[in-house]
Amino acid sequence: MIIENNPATKQQHDDWRLRIKAEFSDTDFSVSSDYLCLIHYLDKAPQKFYSREAFKQYLTFLESVKLTDPKLLADILIEAEPLLSVSNRILTEVNDKPIHDTFLPKEHNDLINFIDKEIHYNLLKIYETPFFYLSKIIANYHWIKTKKATDGLDLYNSVEQLKKVGFGFVDKFYLHDVRNGIAHGKVIFTDVDITYIDKKGGKANIPTRKIIDTLDGILDIANGFCLAFKVFSLTNSDFFETYGIQIPQSILLEELQAKANGPAWTITNCLESVAMQDKKQLMIYVKNDNWDYSKVHWYSFTTAM
């Protein structure tokens, strides 16, 4: 493809592909060259600290079920696609926040203010969107196989199901009482710990700094799950095409950015829309700092390709 031969980025992209293949040596990348967005899990923090256990277990599940129950897996992924796209976008937003690998406030009052403003809010976002909807794919499959109605498959039940099928490591970082206290109840700070009270009066006491470790841990797991889903979706094009599964739009945007971004040219978003006569179109938003019209023309063409 022309876009892959952009002289400004070709050497870098070739290097990325070599490094990605080396990092995920058990994966066959021969079916497509569209996997450059995975470089974030090698170079960017906190993505590069993803849970290796979560990644391996999740990818093993997807590959296994693709062989044993392809139609059921396809149905689950088709239904989940819009929320998986939102989940990936929210996970990226939390990953990009300047709250990771930073010095914590030394004064206790400053620390609990940081926890209240940054940790609790982002912990709840991770629990309720990327962690939940990525976990729900696995739980949904097992509930359907055991003929359980999936209407009641909420976050708590999804986690309980995961713990039964080899994902027990999530129990350390999914704290249900903490989640309920932040979302629906009350949070009380003391000099040594934090008390989370849910709407029914249940309480959980957590050491102050442990809640920061909890965010780090659940973020690493969510990143591991999301990475596994990206590897699976970007290397199983035949399966996706056969069953009409759409790769979540936010993942496609990441791949487009990884491939088409260049010096003074940054893709910021893309949206599907309907033009006159009900014709579908894709609007791509770009931040351009080029003054040379020929460069703008080149990048516009290669981005559209």
Where are these predicted regions, by residue range?
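Extended charged low-complexity segments that act as oligomerization/scaffolding linkers
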Residues: M1, K163-V165, D238, I251
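Generic structural signal for well-ordered, non-transmembrane alpha-helical segments
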Residues: E63, L124-E128, N180, I212, ...
